[in-house]
Amino acid sequence: MSNNEINNNISMSKNIERPKFPKRAVITAGMPYGNKELHLGHIGGVFVHADAFARFLRDRIGKDNVIFVSGTDCYGSPISENYRQLVEKGEFKGTIEEYVQHYHKLQKEVLDKYNISLNLFGASGLGRAKEIHREMSLDFIETLYKHNHLKKLTTSQFYDTEYDVLLNGRQVVGRCPIAGCSSDKGYADECSLGHQYMPSDLIDPKSTLSGKKPAMVDVTNWYFNLDEFHDLLGQWVEQ
């Protein structure tokens, strides 16, 4: 390397700004559903990256200024559906809360074995975290309602006439209507390969409860008016 090249490299290195770090930081890792044990994909695909970042920031800005949190997601149709199937087969006895508590404990044990440095691994539907989630969710919805950011919409939803119950996304199984899709399972509005569609387009739908074709009924729910925030979100992304 010539003297000119060395001098140019030195000059370039002087112009590189040091990274700026926040005074405090909250690091989060995706919350696994409370119906399964953690596997290598969870650890390597979610927690290791967040753990490395949390450890790095603790070294830079001090451990007291970094909080690394995650937890068990206690809500969702996969949990309720798996719980129902196990109870019907006689493979689990207890409440759905006890079912989730069982897997929450197993998940925490696995994370401890891998030495993932979480400050808190909670559970959205258990203990004090359950109370906090309820309070925060209520406050969030009431604030949106007060500022007219919610609207009522009527949509079609699957209904099992034999069990007299509305079916959630995982309680309906059929074939994906997207052309060329090779998925072996299509659920209410999304197949196992991630294609999304309207529930009415699902081919040959069957209720996992009765095994029969469910009816379609109109259901009215509150929806967040995301369109109102299009410009604001665009500005935020540009920043």
Positions of PLM-derived features:
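N-terminal, positively charged nucleic-acid-binding surface of large information/translation enzymes
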Residues: 3-238
